[in-house]
Amino acid sequence: MQMEFSFSSPSFFFLLPFLFLLIKPLISRKSSLKLPPGPKKFPIVGNLFQMEGLLPHLALKKMTDKYGPICHLKLGELEAVVVSSAELAKEVLNTHAVTFADRPVTNVSKIVMYNNSGMTFARYGDYFKLLRQIYASELLSPKRVRSSSNHMEDELSKFVVKIQAETGKPIFLHDRVKSYLFAVLFDSMIGGVCKCPERYIEAAKELSANSAAMRLEDFFPSVTLLPKLSGFNTVLAKLKKEIDDLLDDLISEREKRPANATGPMEEHMLDVLLKLRNGSGSEAKIPITNEDIKAVVFELMLANLSTAATEEWAMSEMMRNPKVFKKAQDEVRRAFKGKNRICASELHKLEYLKLVIKEALRMHPPAPLLFPRKAREDCEIGGYTIPAGTMVWVNYWAVGRDPQLWHDADKFEPERFSDTSIDFNGSHSELIPFGAGRRICPGILYSATNLELLLSALLYHFDWELPSGEKPEEIDMDEFYGSGCIRKNPLALVPKVVIPCQA
């Protein structure tokens, strides 16, 4: 999530005196607590101005470099704490998992994500626990990922054939990768091809780009006039209507299928959710509404964008490090020698490629600031008091670049994971790009499988060059931050077919 600040509006300065009157009663209690250290807080705005000019994970890293691995901030009306060490991240995400299991509410989560529905934004409680169970046992279970492998392979072959048709020309991989990921998701979701998939992709991209998830309005929640003055809620309402129409069509089409069209083994993701809505699922102790279903479906689409971003970062780093690229490519070509397509059943042979993915996730996590938590009660972290209601960020980008944890932390070196058990499953606090604890991302296996398939196909079937004689060290690695961290400028590469594929 990104913080976006704009103080140029005259309305903001007009409201300053009223904001001060609202905030003043909160100051006395905080002064008696042992809060973490942090920068000086200015009246009303707190530390908001100090966040301008840098991407949020970099701005917060700069603060924790000065004040220590736990840092207290005042962001408008909100109390916030940032932790930037593996040890403190473990305290927040694991040791005190229940205390920090809630999410803060934002305009984006309220308006676009169906009043904080879906697993990502839901408040911690019975509804969240039900969704977590549904994800684990049905939607993204190991069984479903395995059953999707044949279709993944088929879509991967189509993906490769399309790239083959453009051999010798610079191409942007990211759009083709998204098309593959959405085709796989729709097959898992409805058992077939979706009408106009590009409309869903564009809607997800637009929401991601607009998910500067905490804006000025979010930092002053008591000032209900701010959203109207900024006009951002109008933008969100228009986007919500577009998303709503798309998802209503998807659900309606699925409901029209004949009752005997699918057997138990052919039940797809949307079928599972519709069954729960109708009260016939074994977990249906809490009513599931159409809005809940739409929130879950759309958050799965948004997750595809994170997988696509990780694939692009991994290719970028391998192109910048030719020795790593060759080592990974040699391994893939040995594993699939003599075959004309990539098979999911052989992915277990790719030990080095798995290290490449770990290293890409260490250096370029999908969400450099893990989705924020909200303290449900007062709690002590690192010897400091975190008051109830405080928003807590784990700056995983800082953990992934911590020189006390990683030798040559800014160097892309997959070998650092050789002969270690460190994995991104949430049990090793030094590598938590998907989070940890009760709110860990439920789609780790699904995402990792798609990443391995995509990178294997790109390395196996093609050699790759940079366009116009660009040198590896000249590759632009600038970031853009929306709902996650992506390349600011898409990676352009020139494919050369080596091992043709037939779809």
UniProtKB/Swiss-Prot annotation:
The chain crosses the membrane at residues 7-27. The keyword Oxidoreductase applies. Heme binds at residue 441. Keywords: Heme, Iron, Membrane, Metal-binding, Monooxygenase, Oxidoreductase, Transmembrane, Transmembrane helix. InterPro entries: Cyt_P450, Cyt_P450_CS, Cyt_P450_E_grp-I, Cyt_P450_sf. It is a single-pass membrane protein. GO terms for molecular function: heme binding; iron ion binding; monooxygenase activity; oxidoreductase activity, acting on paired donors, with incorporation or reduction of molecular oxygen. Its EC number is 1.14.19.80. Its cofactor is heme. The keyword Nucleotidyltransferase does not apply. GO terms for biological process: alkaloid biosynthetic process. It is an enzyme of class 1 (oxidoreductase). SUPFAM superfamilies: Cytochrome P450 (SSF48264). It is found in: Membrane. One of its GO terms (cellular component) is membrane. It comes from the Eukaryota. It catalyses: (19E)-geissoschizine + reduced [NADPH--hemoprotein reductase] + O2 = akuammicine + formate + oxidized [NADPH--hemoprotein reductase] + H2O + H(+); (19E)-geissoschizine + reduced [NADPH--hemoprotein reductase] + O2 = 3,17-didehydrostemmadenine + oxidized [NADPH--hemoprotein reductase] + 2 H2O; 3,17-didehydrostemmadenine = 17-dehydropreakuammicine. Pathway: Alkaloid biosynthesis. Monooxygenase involved in the biosynthesis of curare monoterpene indole alkaloids (MIAs), natural products such as diaboline, a pharmacologically active compound used to regulate blood pressure. Curare alkaloids act as animal glycine receptor antagonists. Catalyzes the conversion of geissoschizine to dehydropreakuammicine by cyclization, which is spontaneously converted into akuammicine by aromatization. Belongs to the cytochrome P450 family. This is Geissoschizine oxidase. It comes from Strychnos sp. The gene is GO.
